[in-house]
Amino acid sequence: MARYRGPVEKIERRFGVSLNLKGERRLAGKSSLEKRPYAPGQHGQRRSKISEYGLQLREKQKAKFMYGISEKQFRSIFQEANRLEGNTGELLIKLLERRLDNVVYRMGFATTRRFARQMVSHGHVLVDGKRVNIPSYMVLPGQKVEIREKSKNNPQVQRSIELTKQTGIAPWVDVDQAKVFGIFTRLPEREEVVIPVEERLIVELYSK
């Protein structure tokens, strides 16, 4: 299944929760979810009862849309989490948080993961001084992530940095906003990752 490229706010309305797919609009109170807190379509205001499988699938879909990855990528990350020793659900979230596009987002250099992914793909991001244009690159604790010199004054990047003064920065990264770089200091604890996803249901889905 390819990555979704349609209207992102319809996705949030479908699930009834904010996935921060339109970061600045959400902060300004202009997201369509706040205006119309029900699913899109003729019968959107009716919430039908969801089966156990439906709930499990829903959680997987939320995680996929939130992190902006395809089914193939998501399954691959899950398989890696399942291979490692420990709580598979928590390991899944930690692996998702290590993706370079997500780290750029968590450091506050992009208002959304989608913009962060574009920044990485277009070669605007360096890891330990070397350009990396693969959004799925797994960042290791201690690695330095920065916006390349020519892109540091990009209006969208600067706007993103300003907005982090309202939202704050993830506690597992150390950021120098003036120099537009950060250090991925450690893996996050599960309780630190505030996302509307019950990873336990995803594990149950893939365990069938």
UniProtKB/Swiss-Prot annotation:
Pfam families: Ribosomal_S4 (PF00163), S4 (PF01479). SMART domains: Ribosomal_S4, S4. InterPro entries: Ribosomal_uS4 (IPR022801), Ribosomal_uS4_bac-type (IPR005709), Ribosomal_uS4_CS (IPR018079), Ribosomal_uS4_N (IPR001912), S4_RNA-bd (IPR002942), S4_RNA-bd_sf (IPR036986). It comes from the Bacteria. GO terms for biological process: ribosomal small subunit biogenesis; translation. Disulfide bonds: none annotated. Residues 98-161 form the S4 RNA-binding domain. Keywords: Ribonucleoprotein, Ribosomal protein, RNA-binding, rRNA-binding. Residues 30-51 are annotated as: Disordered. The keyword Magnesium does not apply. GO terms for molecular function: rRNA binding; structural constituent of ribosome. PANTHER family: 30S 40S RIBOSOMAL PROTEIN, SMALL RIBOSOMAL SUBUNIT PROTEIN US4M. Part of the 30S ribosomal subunit. Contacts protein S5. The interaction surface between S4 and S5 is involved in control of translational fidelity. One of the primary rRNA binding proteins, it binds directly to 16S rRNA where it nucleates assembly of the body of the 30S subunit. Belongs to the universal ribosomal protein uS4 family. This is Small ribosomal subunit protein uS4.
